[in-house]
Regions:
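N-terminal catalytic cores of peptidoglycan-degrading enzymes
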Residues: 1-114
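Basic/polar, cationic surfaces and motifs that engage anionic cell-wall
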Residues: 2-17, 32-33, 114, 118-120, ...
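Conserved, mostly hydrophobic/aromatic
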Residues: 41, 123, 141
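Residues immediately flanking
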Residues: 43-44, 125, 161
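Internal catalytic-core helix/loop-beta-alpha segment
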Residues: 92, 120-125
Length: 202
């Protein structure tokens, strides 16, 4: 099936030209010979369920004031990052060069390979597990996936919950896998679950 979504603007190294850039210090080199063939989809909001603030940017750049909100004490000292972050309005931000290893997956495994940070690109959606995502987010997400597939041998898309089952639940039941597949025009084999499941229906 031909892709329905065009890839976003050109690359400059591992930086996507159509994204706004906010470099994070939380990254490292990928292992020699790493095959970047997986896109991992996450959801995040800080504090949980609150949208539009600067807290995700501050977390990914190690500038979050841990005392600003009671929830932040539970993540105090956390150093994480994602390659991309898509806000509710579809605005795309990039924190880490895709040629580098972002710190988004944690303890994880996919198709027999552990440590998914080594060979994946992480994309955070502004949202809360169980909540619906915005049409603009799906459109931007599909464009990023298409762009990644032009630059890297991307073969699969999975949720954080798929690579860390029992430990992570995002992006959650509000994420519609069938909608992403429809936007991309990719075969169902590239996605983590049967697309006729309730949570996967558009």
């Amino acid at each position: 099936m031909a892709p329905k979504t065009e890839a976003l603007a050109a690359w400059s190294g591992g930086w996507l030209g159509s994204a706004r850039h906010c470099p994070s210090p939380n990254f490292g080199p990928r292992p020699a010979g790493a095959l970047i063939d997986l896109v991992v989809i996450h959801s995040i909001s800080l504090p949980p369920g609150e949208y539009g603030g600067p807290e995700v940017f501050e977390l990914f750049t190690n500038r979050l004031d841990w005392d600003r909100h009671p929830y932040f004490d539970a993540i105090r000292g956390l150093e994480v990052s994602s390659h991309f972050y898509i806000r509710r309005d579809g605005t795309l931000w990039q924190f880490v060069d895709c040629d580098a290893r972002a710190w988004h997956a944690g303890r994880s495994s996919w198709r027999g390979r552990d440590n998914c940070n080594d060979d994946s690109v992480g994309i955070e959606l502004e949202g809360l597990e169980g909540d619906e995502f915005e049409p603009a987010q799906y459109q931007t997400l599909a464009g990023v996936c298409a762009a990644l597939a032009e630059r890297y041998p991307v073969a699969y898309v999975a949720g954080h919950s798929d690579i860390a089952p029992g430990r992570k639940n995002d992006p959650g039941t509000g994420f519609h896998w069938a909608r992403l597949r429809s936007e991309l025009g990719w075969p169902s084999e590239r996605f983590p679950r049967p697309l006729n499941e309730t949570a996967g229906k558009a």
